[in-house]
């Protein structure tokens, strides 16, 4: 480096090698991202032209399509323009969580101005300061915030439902072009001088958020939670990365956001969210099957959080700054064992270097700790009206920058000094290691301790010194609390911490109250500790580290002595009296790591360390115990006695089943029973009234096929016939679906569950091969059909005593089981034969009843939105080549059955299932054959993830279902992005995949009744040939035989695409009626599907336009 730059100052050399310099240059070349030419509101306008009817915003208070959002923002922009608002103006916006907040921000940018989010929780004094700094003339606010903003001294335009301009076809607004460097927004953060500082971001930097979607795994099918405050960078990222991609933004109410976040996310079918690890800790993946991607930031993930979440979602960690629009780095997908908790990943939108924290002219070697410096198109412009702070943070590039830039690349105007300590890992990823200054992070939000210390000095009487820091008591499970250390004047003690006087504690209460009028709630300390002395370092500075360390040695019980009023006054009325008080005391003891015996009814949980996050956890825990609380209840009534009085009794959410109650009326019940008495001998005089339920759509589908399924387990060894007979009888008693018969009358098809059926084990002895004999047994039944009013369940045992070989044959109708539940039957037989007790299980009737208990409104609304404007893709819409004759065609004159095997199929990309890969390939084939960008096909789902039924996995029965899936094909997408889109689209449907297809069509679409899905994809990833483990015998072979034709009444208008792993690779079968698809066409479909499966998996970087090219 010296030879290339002889004039470089010695101080700029540092201790970095030429090899490291070259590596940094390569890493930064990979990360460089060009700025966009479009402005954010132009990008969203383009999405409105592409997807006019698609839902852009789904909020608790209504929805907007992209067209509605764009038009309303244009109308509001014209209102602003008529008031003289334009480029370089700042417009404050203040909204509770609402769809109108999105309109407001977009409108301000369309007017050419910059929006300034003002969170409704901010105290009036801070709002006035923001208005004064921005010199704003007009603000936009919701109904509830209009008065408060007006009282702050500004003209307010109220933005609410009365503004709905849907019927106005031509917007009044005419495009304004503020310029790429004009301000787009300004965010205010904590400032070290006691006042917040405004960070101004220009239009070009703002628009660059659109380029982050692929790295964040946000695509047009995503449903993104809007959780963060719009006053923080991540709140804006949630909104504008979503809208610039054509995805849907989901906005719960403030109440749901704080009190029942998991429920809100599930009801809105959220697939993507960004949350701080602290907030994430209040949730469980078990409660949100809809979630696909979880991104965290602001704090490091704990190892326990990775363990909990990584197996269930795509887990990422990002790094962003207020001074950098959107994300700057994002990690690879995090798995349980291979990602350090502080690894923030790789730059996605610029370049970075790590320099000496005390001298940014000196670069640090790879692996050494230093200050992170960044250069990115996303960078903010300045701190509003604060040139000194701007100059200190946005620096001229040091001399070493020239050596780091590739040829013909322009020198950056500035670098941003983040103040964050970091180091490069050997793979180019970055580890975040804290701050070089005293800046704090509270639940992911930036806090300058100097600002709080300034206010505390003014508010505390007779204060000698103050320190604000994050401190973590020993029993806090690693959760640090914002802590104020107060040294009063004339205080003199050898003890670091001293017990508070009554006057001190009363002063703390007064100071808390005053702070609520000055700073945001998250900046109010949880703990106030009185000091006997202020520890100092050898250089005479306040020893913050020692204060943190000493708090880290305190148990909660010892800490209470330094912070509660009761300790100073003497404890009064300590006994918990009501059941609600006792329940709440146990909840808070668990959350705050206290001995429940030390809590009394007058204890203030806020004084004991509670905050909004622990309050959210308390709300959820209380609901489970039957108490209804909200976060606002907790803050309004912080003592246990008051809280117990404000709590409401709520029902628990467990599903209650009543097996003696039917879902059919008395007339239908009597018709069913009369039929069985007349046609069968199954009901005798001692028979209790059996359970009668409607047959599900899937049961009707399988009954229409009118065929039996046979499973033959070839067993080598000695069999105990009596034990086998008893095992089969026990299985029938265990699973009521095996005792079910079907009855059809004018009202439909119904299933009748009997208390018992004949369960004889038919025994056949032979000298021949038992497998051959078994096949002979079911061959004569090929033309027979399932009789509705007779049990399908039958057990047979074929034995060759000389060969000590047997075949245990189970016969059922597919209306009694599905692949996922088959092991429940086999396991029951094996457990009983082997002498083990059976575990309790639910019945298929519990599943049906749970389905009927669901409120279907949200489900039908989802399907209505999901399928709006789309229709199924049919074979008649395809243009086939159809030149190759199939080599494997069914002999059934009406049936086409083509097989295609992919030898050595490729592994699926990370995070993608084989079912997704096959559906994606199928959608591409249909897109190519129809030349359509939107494909709707059918998919088989197991139907067990969407119902709140604990133990649903123990049910034997056909819970599977057929539902539509909508796939979009964007030619510029890479294969990887397309695969994630297909998988995310599937996951969206899982919350409501229990609904009957016929009902979805009737309630949620304009399709004709009985519309077929065109093509239905079914990936068989369950081994129906699983072994049965019986004592003294070896299961040497399993045979699965399906009788009857593949084509029956309900299959005559659809093509079925089956896929299954086999020993030779992956087998793909195309089945259907010859009236729908010919054998050559089916062969063409199978071949193309196989080719696309391999290309998508092996070339994830390839664009769809190239993959689909003829």
From Swiss-Prot:
Enzyme class: ligase
Keyword Phosphoprotein attached: yes
Gene Ontology biological process terms, A to Z: amino acid activation for nonribosomal peptide biosynthetic process; secondary metabolite biosynthetic process
Phenotype of null mutants: Leads to the accumulation of the benzomalvin dipeptide precursor anthranilate-N-methylphenylalanine (Anth-NmPhe).
Keywords: Ligase, Phosphopantetheine, Phosphoprotein
SUPFAM superfamilies: Acetyl-CoA synthetase-like, ACP-like, CoA-dependent acyltransferases
Its job: Nonribisomal peptide synthetase; part of the gene cluster that mediates the biosynthesis of benzomalvin A and D. The pathway begins with the loading of amino acid precursors onto the A domains of the non ribosomal peptide synthetases benY and benZ. BenY and the A1 domain of benZ are loaded with anthranilate (Anth), while the A2 domain of benZ is loaded with phenylalanine (Phe). N-methylation of Phe by the methyltransferase benX may happen before loading of Phe onto benZ, after loading of Phe, or after dipeptide formation.
Protein's name in the database: Nonribisomal peptide synthetase benY
Source organism (scientific name): Aspergillus terreus
Lineage: Eukaryota, Fungi, Dikarya, Ascomycota, Pezizomycotina
Gene coding for it: benY
């Amino acid at each position: 480096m010296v030879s290339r730059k002889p004039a470089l100052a010695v101080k700029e050399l540092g201790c970095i090698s030429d090899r490291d310099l070259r590596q940094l240059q390569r890493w930064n070349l990979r990360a460089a991202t060009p700025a966009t030419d479009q402005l954010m509101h132009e990008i969203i306008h383009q999405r409105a032209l592409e997807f006019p009817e698609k839902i852009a915003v789904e909020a608790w208070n209504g929805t907007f399509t992209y067209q509605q959002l764009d038009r309303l923002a244009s109308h509001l922009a014209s209102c602003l323009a008529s008031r003289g608002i334009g480029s370089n103006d700042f417009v404050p916006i203040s909204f509770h969580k609402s769809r109108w907040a999105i309109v407001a921000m977009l409108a301000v940018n369309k007017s050419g101005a910059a929006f300034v989010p003002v969170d409704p929780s901010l105290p009036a004094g801070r709002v006035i300061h923001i208005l004064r700094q921005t010199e704003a003339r007009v603000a936009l606010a919701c109904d509830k915030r209009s008065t408060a903003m007006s009282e702050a001294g500004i003209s307010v335009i109220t933005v609410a439902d009365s503004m709905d301009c849907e019927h106005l076809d031509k917007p009044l607004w005419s495009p304004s072009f503020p310029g790429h460097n004009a301000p787009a927004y300004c965010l205010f953060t904590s400032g070290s001088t006691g006042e917040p500082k405004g960070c101004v971001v220009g239009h070009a930097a703002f628009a660059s958020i659109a380029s982050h979607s692929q790295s964040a795994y946000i695509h047009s099918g995503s449903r993104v939670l809007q959780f963060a405050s719009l006053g923080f960078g991540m709140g804006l990222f949630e909104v504008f990365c979503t809208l610039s991609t054509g995805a849907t933004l989901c906005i719960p109410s403030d109440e749901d956001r704080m009190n029942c976040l998991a429920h809100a996310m599930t009801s809105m079918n959220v697939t993507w969210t960004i949350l701080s690890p602290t907030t994430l800790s209040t949730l469980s993946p078990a409660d949100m099957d809809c979630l696909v991607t979880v991104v965290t930031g602001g704090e490091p993930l704990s190892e326990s959080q990775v363990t909990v979440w990584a197996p269930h979602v795509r887990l990422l960690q990002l790094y962003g700054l207020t001074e950098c629009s959107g994300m700057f780095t994002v990690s690879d997908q995090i798995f349980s064992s291979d990602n350090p908790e502080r690894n923030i990943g790789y730059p996605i939108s610029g370049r970075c270097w790590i320099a000496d924290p005390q001298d940014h002219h000196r670069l640090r070697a790879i692996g050494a700790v230093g200050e992170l410096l960044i250069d990115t198109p996303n960078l903010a412009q300045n701190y509003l009206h604060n040139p000194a702070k701007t100059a200190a943070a946005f620096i001229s590039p040091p001399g070493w920058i020239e050596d780091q830039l590739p040829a013909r690349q322009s020198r950056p105007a500035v670098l941003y000094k983040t103040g964050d300590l970091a180091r490069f890992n050997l793979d180019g990823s970055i580890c975040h290691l804290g701050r070089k200054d005293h800046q704090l992070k509270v639940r992911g939000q930036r806090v300058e301790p100097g600002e709080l210390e300034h206010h505390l000095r003014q508010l505390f009487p007779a204060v000698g010194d103050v320190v604000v820091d994050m401190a973590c008591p020993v029993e806090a499970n690693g959760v640090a609390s914002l802590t104020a250390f107060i040294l009063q004047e004339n205080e003199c003690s050898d003890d670091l911490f001293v017990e508070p006087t009554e006057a001190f504690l009363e002063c703390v209460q007064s100071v808390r109250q005053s702070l609520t009028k000055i700073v945001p709630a998250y900046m109010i300390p949880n703990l106030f500790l009185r000091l006997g002395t202020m520890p100092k370092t050898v250089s005479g500075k306040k020893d913050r580290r020692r204060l943190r360390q000493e708090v880290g040695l305190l148990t909660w019980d010892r800490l209470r002595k330094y912070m509660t009023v009761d300790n100073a006054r003497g404890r009064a009325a300590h006994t918990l009296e009501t059941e609600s008080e006792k329940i709440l005391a146990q909840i808070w003891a668990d959350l705050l790591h206290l001995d429940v015996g030390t809590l009394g009814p007058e204890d203030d949980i806020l004084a004991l360390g509670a905050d909004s996050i622990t309050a959210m956890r308390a709300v959820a825990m209380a609901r489970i115990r039957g108490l209804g609380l909200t976060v606002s209840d907790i803050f309004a009534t912080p003592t246990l006695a008051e809280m117990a009085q404000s709590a409401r009794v709520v029902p628990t959410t467990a599903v209650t089943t009543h097996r003696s109650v039917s879902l059919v009326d008395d007339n239908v019940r009597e018709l069913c029973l009369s039929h069985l008495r007349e046609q069968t001998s199954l009901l005798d005089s001692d028979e209790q009234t059996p359970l009668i339920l409607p047959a599900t759509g899937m049961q009707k589908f399988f009954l229409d096929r009118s065929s039996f399924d046979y499973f033959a387990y070839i067993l080598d060894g000695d069999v105990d016939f009596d034990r086998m007979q008893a095992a089969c009888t026990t299985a029938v008693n265990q699973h009521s679906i095996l005792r079910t018969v079907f009855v059809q009358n004018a009202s439909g098809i119904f299933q009748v569950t009997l208390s018992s059926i004949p369960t004889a084990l038919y025994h056949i002895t032979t000298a021949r091969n038992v497998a051959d004999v078994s096949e002979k047994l079911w061959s004569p039944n090929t033309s027979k059909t399932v009789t509705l009013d007779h049990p399908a369940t039958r057990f047979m045992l074929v034995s060759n005593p000389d060969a000590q070989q047997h075949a245990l044959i189970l016969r059922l109708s597919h209306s009694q089981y599905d692949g996922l539940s088959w092991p429940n039957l086999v396991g029951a037989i094996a457990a009983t034969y082997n002498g083990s007790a059976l575990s309790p299980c639910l019945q298929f009737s519990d599943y049906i009843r749970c389905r009927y208990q669901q409120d279907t409104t949200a489900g039908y609304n989802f399907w209505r939105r999901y399928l709006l404007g789309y229709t199924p893709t049919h074979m008649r819409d395809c243009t086939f080549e159809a030149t190759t004759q199939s080599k494997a065609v069914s002999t059934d004159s009406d049936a086409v059955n083509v097989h295609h095997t992919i030898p050595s199929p490729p592994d699926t990309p990370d995070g993608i299932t084989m079912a997704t890969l096959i559906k994606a390939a199928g959608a591409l084939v249909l897109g190519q054959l129809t030349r359509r960008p939107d494909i709707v096909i059918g998919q088989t789902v197991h139907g067990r993830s969407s119902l709140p039924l604990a133990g649903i996995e123990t049910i034997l029965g056909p819970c599977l279902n057929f539902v539509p899936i909508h796939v979009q094909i964007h030619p510029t997408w890479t294969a990887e992005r397309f695969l994630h889109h297909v998988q995310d689209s599937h996951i969206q449907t899982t919350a409501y995949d229990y609904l009957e297809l016929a009902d979805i069509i009737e309630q949620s679409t304009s399709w004709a009744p009985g519309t077929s899905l065109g093509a239905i994809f079914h990936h068989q990833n369950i081994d129906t040939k699983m072994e049965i483990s019986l004592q003294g015998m070896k299961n040497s072979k399993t045979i699965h035989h399906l009788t009857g034709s593949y084509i029956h009444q309900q299959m005559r208008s659809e093509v079925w695409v089956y896929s299954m792993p086999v020993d030779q690779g992956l087998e793909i079968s195309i089945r259907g009626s010859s009236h729908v698809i010919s054998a050559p066409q089916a062969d063409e479909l199978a071949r193309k599907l196989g080719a696309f499966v391999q290309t998508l998996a092996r070339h994830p970087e390839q664009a769809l336009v190239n993959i689909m090219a003829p």
